[in-house]
């Protein structure tokens, strides 16, 4: 089984979807802790898109010299079989922002 790490950017096939859920094959950020990633067949992800507006639950960052957005308001858990490729790790500054937005949005 492939090992996936928290804050790793991966390509995920999100189809099939319903309604306003983000769809198709796209980059996603793994946000579940490594302990969960190691022991379960699922990971929790935030989809990434290059087409978004500024919004409090969306964080911009550069990926392949293109501005992309981590869509924290569409966080969800997926089976690892949906992952098709590992791209790399999110930068430290963006990780700090992701943690803060997740805490602000879901913990308080």
Predicted segments with their positions:
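Conserved functional hotspots at enzyme active or ligand-binding sites that engage polyanionic ligands
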Residues: 1-108
């Amino acid at each position: 089984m492939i090992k996936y790490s928290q804050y790793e950017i991966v390509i995920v096939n999100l189809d099939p979807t319903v309604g306003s859920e983000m769809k198709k094959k796209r980059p996603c950020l793994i946000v579940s802790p490594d302990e969960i990633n190691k022991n379960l067949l699922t990971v929790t992800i935030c989809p990434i898109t290059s087409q978004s507006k500024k919004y409090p639950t969306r964080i911009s960052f550069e990926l392949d010299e293109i501005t992309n957005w981590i869509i924290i308001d569409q966080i969800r858990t997926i089976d690892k079989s949906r992952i098709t490729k590992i791209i790399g790790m999110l930068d430290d500054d963006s990780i700090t922002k992701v943690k803060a937005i997740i805490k602000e949005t879901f913990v308080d």
